[in-house]
Amino acid sequence: MNKSTNDKINKAFFNMRIYLVIFLSIIIPVSGQELSNQKKKEIFEVDRLSSKGPNAAPDRRKDEGKGPYKRLVIRGGTVIDGTGGPPRGPIDIVIENNKIVKVQDVGYPGIPIDESKRPKKGDYEINATGMYILPGFVDLHIHTGNQFKAPDAEYTYKLWMAHGITTVRGVALGPTEWALNEKERSAKNEIVAPRIYVYDRPGNGADWKGGPINDPETAKKWVRYAKKKGVDGLKLTSPRPKIMKALLDEANANKMGSVAHLEQKGVAEMNLIDAARLGLKNQTHFYGLFEALYKNNDVQPWPYDMNYNN
């Protein structure tokens, strides 16, 4: 077979593949996607409610918790410190102005404690004899909810607190201004809630006038805007590499945190190794990690019927 004939055959097969792909793209999506009007209304209602933030937590009642105290002492507990070491005790813990200042061994199990060697008396004391003491848990990926699911932030906060979570990183906690206000109220002990760190998505903010984040300079302007508002860090997806670099450069220069859900829409240009090299601090979910492990950092072999929006 001469070269000319071979080229014609290859071209014919190439065109056939194109027609086949177009044909499949026409007929495949039609199957099984007819929705009733009622179902469409339900979907639109869920979308409408999901776009609205939750109700703010009510002010703390007088019977909800005690303190803070100038000097709080927790006495005689067995501590699990979270480092991987074994439990130990009895231990006295001294907290002054909401800060742990001393963790002191005061004896041995089953042997009377020498009171003269214990920390001095506190304004308020808790007898933790026979109890275990752990540091508060930190949840690095939380959302409060919305008007469709978990519409009351009070419920969410108290659920976290009841499970020992005393610090949270919202990614995002809720709408920007709402989240910053809840962060401030928590810091002032005006509400029953964990300590809150606010991470936000580029372009968010009711008074942001810079438009969509479509170029590196706008990306940097938004980071400076967010920093000024009191945002603690960035919640990213997988923007184009130049924009990702600009966001991370400016965030790191302003001592802000960063976390990314490297969604599959952009993972061909930005896997986890790429993002880490640009200065990303944390990853959430696992998108971008597996692609970084592929030979030559390839992307997954998507099924022909995959639809990212499904």
Which residues does each PLM region occupy?
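Envelope-exposed proteins and targeting segments
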Residues: 70, 75, 89-91, 164, ...
